[in-house]
């Protein structure tokens, strides 16, 4: 594009062309620049027109929304004014005055804003409208068209003259002759150029200075708006300052009233709760006390059902398999196709029943680890199963809330499923029987059922809520009745308890004016006390944290001293001093694992759950998991894995705990770590700990006994309870206790399993043998005899039907000190002592019986003389103590002389 020509240059060139013929040539040369200037100016004007159109739309939107804002603000003012009048009618003069004055201020500001919006419309919007409409009527486009036509005429004339000159064969013409011939065309072009520049100039004035002047006027309107609004706000500012102070006082007064009302409400709720429990004691099994927002079953189907369902397999093929199912005592049992496999037992409290809306004959049972898909014969059968499952679940839930055990719940089904539950139930009962555990650890409420697993204390439901607010860093709350606890989670509760815990944590509790809440205290006082006790350790037995004392407590297995160190703020992540005051050696948890035994497992558990730093490394880079694998501490390893210790951590040598277990050939630790690393570790884990309880399992039939004996999948009862320090002999022939460690022996044909219990009222009696002649006075004798047996001994019928043994009362005597003193005895087996007047020849080894012989003396019908044992030389047939070996060979019982042992 040629260079543009300004208006001043156009005026100068045109004046020169008009004044002298010489200027014609100069103007002719600049005519293209004149045309380019006109085109550029037109393009700029068109761009400005588009921008002004956008401004016009924005101004209209502001005006419209401004009017809407003014209207909405007027509604707001009316509402505030109505609120002020309402408070005025309630004699709340301070509040009403504030609302009314702010309503007046809102009205003033709204009026100012409305005026501003109107000024925007008048000052800006109207000029824009006239400008846009004048753009269509100013004739600028016509002038531009005429200019273009004049330019074309001029070019046509010049081209025509050049052709004529070429036709006349003139080598060239002078510029003067050419200028004279095109003079008219130049004048027409100059005229239209002037007209266009005039029209374009007028448009530029309107779009530029005139519109800017309008914006300046609107600026003054805005300035006045803000100035008037500032004046209105300044006039109201002193009143607002006074109002803020009075409102603060009113708020404090109302908060005090609300606090008192809240306390009254809590006390009334507690009273109503107690009354409801007293007035409705028989609503235990109704299920109406708890509304579960799930599918509700039809109550007419009951809570028990046995039948067949089709279950979709969980394998690759996923086929429907017919399985016998039963619902009873809040559990669903699913039998396998193989009879010798125990059925699957699912507690319904942790399941959810979901009917299939698409297929009416199907329903799902969602458990914690998988979803079971069931298919019934028809829709009615499906509805019955769903209703029974939901009803049984509701019944179990209601029983759990009312503290009732599910009758027969753990006795129905297979022994394999019931043993962990039996152990947990016994341990829970033992925890509740510990000193102080019959009352809440914090408020003293009766029958607490909520356990802090990391502290080993029992609390009521109100205090447990505050414990949950503290977080798991301070207290990990679980229910003894609602949650499925494992034995390891009761470890600290069995070894600490409320009494011992409060001896440390409430040692400095004031006796007068004590802040300790009661069972009737509100939640605020409970919260303040529990925070002071568990977070601040305000009432604990204070002493200076001493790492040496902590080391001594761990080595001496003193759990309460470790608890006292915890109360004093001892950092368990601090390196403990070495023995005899040497340089710092290892961490507290590492030391506890290294010296761990059955008696010190509670200390390890306490350190793990209360800041034991599971990922902390010792000087050699080993974590606590490495240390447990290094020393083969299987139970410590289980506690660490339960506490989510990092399995993949490596030490300075680049070894994981699994590598160490493999190198040390600790097979059990290796298997456990492999399961943890693969993510297949199942909780809870069995702990080989001296729980202090023993169990004797009976059998309902001989077939069940044989199955238990030969089934490799079922661990023997003694293997599960091998850590119990008190051996209990066969309860059929009175209970005889033998001290010493229990030995685990395999079941064999020569050692039948224990016999069923026939008299549960008999208790353990520890006796001491009387001194007798010879060198047999040091043999232990543990015998007991019920009064009924003594009374009925003279009766022939009683001698043939009842099974008794005579044991003299007394304590335990010491074992033989040398082999020359008597017969050799195996570990954990004590033999009967000599009665007064019995010679050494009358003492015999315990007799082992095969399973066939055991059944023989049950049936009866053969005499003792037919057996091989009867052919042994006996001095006397009466009052001879005979030993009976238990099923695993580790326990014996003493049989009465009246018992006729029949042997094939």
Curated annotation (Swiss-Prot):
Question: Per the record, where are the segments of Low complexity compositional bias?
Answer: 794-806
| One MF term in the entry's GO annotations | zinc ion binding
Q: Record's Gene Ontology CC terms?
A: cytosol; focal adhesion; nucleoplasm; ruffle
Kindly indicate where the leader peptide sits in this chain: none
The UniProt entry annotates ANK repeats at 584-616, 620-649
Cellular location of this protein?
A: Cytoplasm
Write down the superkingdom of origin. Answer: Eukaryota
InterPro entries for the chain: AH/BAR_dom_sf, Ankyrin_rpt, Ankyrin_rpt-contain_sf, ARFGAP/RecO, ArfGAP_dom, ArfGAP_dom_sf, ASAP, ASAP3_ArfGap
What CDD domains has UniProt attached to this entry?
ArfGap_ASAP3, BAR_ASAP3, PH_ASAP
Q: Where is this region: Disordered?
A: 275-297, 697-716, 735-877
Q: Where are the zinc fingers (C4-type)?
A: 440-463
Record has Cell inner membrane as a keyword: no
Sequence ranges of Polar residues compositional bias: 735-750
- Domain PH positions: 302-394
What GO biological process terms does the UniProt entry carry, in alphabetical order?
A: cell migration; positive regulation of GTPase activity; regulation of stress fiber assembly
Coiled-coil segments:
142-169, 249-273
What are the residue boundaries of the Arf-GAP domain, all occurrences included?
Answer: 425-550
- Which PANTHER family would you find in this protein's record? ARF-GAP WITH SH3 DOMAIN, ANK REPEAT AND PH DOMAIN-CONTAINING PROTEIN 3, ASAP FAMILY MEMBER
What does the function comment of this entry state?
A: Promotes cell proliferation.
Protein's UniProt name: Arf-GAP with SH3 domain, ANK repeat and PH domain-containing protein 3
Can you name the source organism? Answer: Mus musculus
Gene from which the chain derives: Asap3
